[in-house]
Amino acid sequence: MLAIVNGKVLTITNGTLDEGVVLIEEGKIKAVGKDIPIPEGAEVIDAKGKMVTPGLIDSHSHLAVFGEPSVWANSDGNEVTDPITPHLRGIDALNPNDPAIKDVLTGGVTTVYTGPGSANLIGGTGFAMKLRGRTVDEMVIPGTEAMKMALGENPKRVYGQGQKRAPNTRMGNAAVLREALEKAQNYMNKMEKAQEKGKSEENSTPPERDLKMEALGRVLRREIKARIHAHRADDIMTAIRIAEEFNLDYIIEHCTEGYKIADILGARKVRATVGPLLMSRSKMELLDVSLANPGILAKAGVTVAIQCDSTAGTRWLACHTGLAVREGMPEDLAM
């Protein structure tokens, strides 16, 4: 048994406790409160003058998919052979022995969402995981799988500039993405009709399976969310148009210029993972990055989660969150 005493305890869901007590048994929080008796024989940590929080959660990372050291051999997050790869699964790229996992734990982060990068318009599924376990099966949190999609500079740079093929423009991004979703919708309809036919015709032959379309079908049926990478305000609105057109359950990733259209996003009850806040203007679509963005979005009614979009850099999640609070995000919403 471990007892943390005298610290300022941020319970997140039940207010803040000054000089609170946290009891931990076998790696799990057993009790949190003000006047909790300390069991005999418990190891006691005096946290006077310090803040105590639950394990932090990074809502968007690439931890252990883009491994460390950051060399080609460990780079498994972007399958840049086709802009539409919904059948890829982040769990097949994750390295539970990535040394960056231990680095991230030192920052108080115990859970991350990780998965494919943003080179492809549809990059495959990511998932949330606990930072413990020897295999991905032990680490993954069931029910957290989501489909990575991306708009903006990355897909058109990788395929248009790099491979001289579509998409080469933002128009191309939207068109190719829509086309894939429409194909998946048609595939679903065809399979449903085949199943009905099979019930009435004993010797009917089912259509050939298409793993790409099956994977996208899960998104269209709202079984899993679409997490759509978009920085610029116009890309954010394109993501919303397409998501609404196909009735997707979606989250906007990054939402860098979201503050420019915060009222529109708030009215739609958009959910966004915002960040990283500690980034440079390395691309044109990052030109108007603002530390005030998370606070403006949260106050407008957007559901905001802070993200680091990193690997080992995820250890600095508390710093990103602190910057958001300094620039106007309410502390309770930031945590």
Predicted segments with their positions:
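Divalent metal-coordination and catalytic microenvironments
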Residues: 7, 22, 27, 49, ...
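Active-site gating loops and adjacent loop-to-helix segments of metal-dependent hydrolytic enzymes
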Residues: 67-94, 135, 150, 155-162, ...
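Histidine-rich, glycine-flanked metal-binding segment
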Residues: 9, 13-53, 70
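Hydrophobic faces of well-ordered beta-strands that scaffold small-molecule active sites
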Residues: 55-59, 112-114, 147, 226-228, ...
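A general structural motif
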Residues: 208-209, 228-232, 254-256, 282-291
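His/Asp/Glu-enriched, well-ordered alpha-helical/loop segment
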Residues: 68-69, 75-81, 85-88, 225, ...
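Polyanionic/metal-chelating signatures
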Residues: 100, 105-250
